[in-house]
Amino acid sequence: MNPQRLAVLLTTVLPITVLLTAPKAAAARESFETVRQQFEARSVTVVSDHPRCSERNLFGLYVRGSRQVIVCRRGNQVNTLLHEGWHLAQARCLKGTSYLGEEWLKAELSWRDRRDLDVLYKSGQWRREAEARYMANQSLERYFAAFDALCTSDATPRPTNSSSERFNPTVND
């Protein structure tokens, strides 16, 4: 490479790249802390240092029967927290059932998500996992509105085949 080009690359392009990527990392940490605080405000304990996190492919889990979600320090921690937090809502607030209809989920999830779910989970787990995956990708406002509606009301809505009456994710925020 031409020495002048290399000098330009090292003095301009590289520092700009570092500046552009550094705030993203900080924003990701802030986002995780923001989501953690949202859960903790709802009396959900979020644990990041747990013995199970030594398991090679474990990103997180919901501790059944508790108000505790474990998020390991790998992967997309925000997505993991939202996914496992939705499992908490399914177990504690929906009593083990799902909120969104299976046919609706199949229509809304990408082909890649559907393929991954088909490969990773047994048919009896598919709907719960698909719903948690879908909900983890919603805006925080939408996610926590649904979470609160399920987990703070006396009359928890029961799931139906068509859940658009309760949750319409196509409505603008």
Q: Positions of the model-derived regions?
A:
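Solvent-exposed loop/turn segments at secondary-structure junctions
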Residues: C53, G75-Q77, K95
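Short pre-active-site segment immediately N-terminal to the catalytic Zn-binding motif
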Residues: G65-L82
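Bacterial N-terminal signal peptides that target proteins for export
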Residues: M1-L10
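Alpha-helical architecture
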Residues: L81-G85, R127
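Acidic/histidine-rich, surface-exposed loop or edge segments in extracytoplasmic proteins
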Residues: Y62-Q68, R114-D116
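Bacterial N-terminal signal peptides
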Residues: L9-V18
